[in-house]
Every structure is written in structure tokens, then in C-alpha cells.
């Protein structure tokens, strides 16, 4: 009986030891991943021009970037060449791929946003297309699922482009292929699937943001949104 009891005690002790070892292994793996993440972190700062954050949580006044025109769409002149190259590569995937939107001033965004709100209120909107009127509060909630208030849109940076092979968005069979090549030209899909908690915006397969080659590569490899990436960088 004593031997059985002792064995039982030994077995229990081993189980606890195994559990501790497994926990230690998981902690070690997690730590290793964090070390690896920081080890290949680009030499970048939160204040870099191509990493500026504009959102409902981080609104900005008019930024007045120097603009250039690519295929009829205005963008920050510093990314014009990258936009042209990215578009050309995307058109190799789908010849119908085209730029839909680029830079928008704060005043332009305000007019656009208010027109969307009015359309939703009248029942002629993207979400409320029933023909039945709704309150302004309801309309604003609807609009914020697909458009941002003035001072909260990345388009005012001149670093964001909307690009698709169709004008009815989130329906392209080529979208994932285009998103996959984006980092080669310094772009990331700004609002990917499963990241609404981080960005505040649902999946948009057409909205690309220029962040620079090294940043785009790192963000893609580590599945990071701009919000998550900036937290890893010094000010």
C-alpha cells in the first residue's frame, strides 16, 4: 500500500512537472516570437511621413501634400511612381484594374460624407436603400460602415488609394491576388479581414495605403495593421 501510494505521489508529481514544462515551453516560444519580431523590425519611427495615422481616433487637420496625378487620380507626389508601378502590376492580374480614388481634401471629404448621410436619411443610401426615411443618428451609423468623417479619412494624406477592377467593391475575385503583390510596391491592404477591432473599419479589399517597402514587408509578414505596427516603433 505504501508503494502504491508512493507511486501515486510520484505520478502526480510528474504530471505537475510536465504541466510546468509545457507552460515554460509555450512561454519560451511566445518570447522567441516577440524577440524575432523585434529583431527584424525596420529602422522606422512613428513620426515618419509614410506612417502617419489618420482615423476617427486620430483625426488630423488638412495636410496639404504636394500632389501628382496618376491616371487621373491625385496622390502625394512622393508615391506617384509606386502607385503607377503597383497599378501596372495589378493590371497584369486583371486588365480592368483601375484607380477609383486618391487624395481628398478635408473639405471635399466633408461634402462627400454629408451627401452620404443625407442619402441614408432619405432611404437612397448604400445601407438604407429601402426608400424609407431614417433618423440622422441612424444614417451616420450606416455611413461610418463605409466612409469616414472629415479629418478622419486616410485619403487626406495622399498616401491612400482605392483600386479595383469593378466599381461595386468587395466583390472582386482578383482582390486577394492584388493584395498579395501590394508590399512589393510599398503598399498594404489597410483594412484586412479580421482586424476591425484594431482599425475600427471592416474589410475593404480596395483600399491600399502606402507605408514604404520595408514597413510593408514587415507588416505583411507579421500580419499587422498600421495601428499595431506603430505600437512597436519609437516616437
Task: Report residues per predicted region.
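Extracytoplasmic cell-surface/polysaccharide-interacting catalytic and binding patches
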Residues: 1-235
